[in-house]
């Protein structure tokens, strides 16, 4: 049997693609073309346009400034890949390096607002059974 020759190139290991597009292809797309690749919720958000605060963040990205933002609802675009941004989590700013895998997600997904609480052991007298524990 003869092998079928496919027009598809074999995918190189380690190369990230988003909906079949490599990072360099994504960066060449216009905002409208990129929006068509996104899931419906993010696509609708982009089609509505950016708020004034989000426009300011985009402008700072293009200038190459260090960015600190409270805009947790902003969608990560391909032109942001490779940059570092500080996202507010309600208490402080969390530094996040934007990777290709983060495209299409929102800033807030990478700056958790709640931390896990680990309580210490109960003190002497905190429970009825600890009344009888000798105090050194």
Curated annotation (Swiss-Prot):
Keywords: Ribonucleoprotein, Ribosomal protein, RNA-binding, rRNA-binding. GO terms for biological process: ribosomal small subunit assembly; translation. It holds the Pfam family Ribosomal_S19. It comes from the Archaea. GO terms for cellular component: cytosolic small ribosomal subunit. GO terms for molecular function: rRNA binding; structural constituent of ribosome. The keyword S-adenosyl-L-methionine does not apply. Residues 114-136 are annotated as: Disordered. Protein S19 forms a complex with S13 that binds strongly to the 16S ribosomal RNA. Belongs to the universal ribosomal protein uS19 family. NCBIfam families: PRK04038.1, uS19_arch. This is Small ribosomal subunit protein uS19. It comes from Methanosarcina acetivorans (strain ATCC 35395 / DSM 2834 / JCM 12185 / C2A). The gene is rps19.
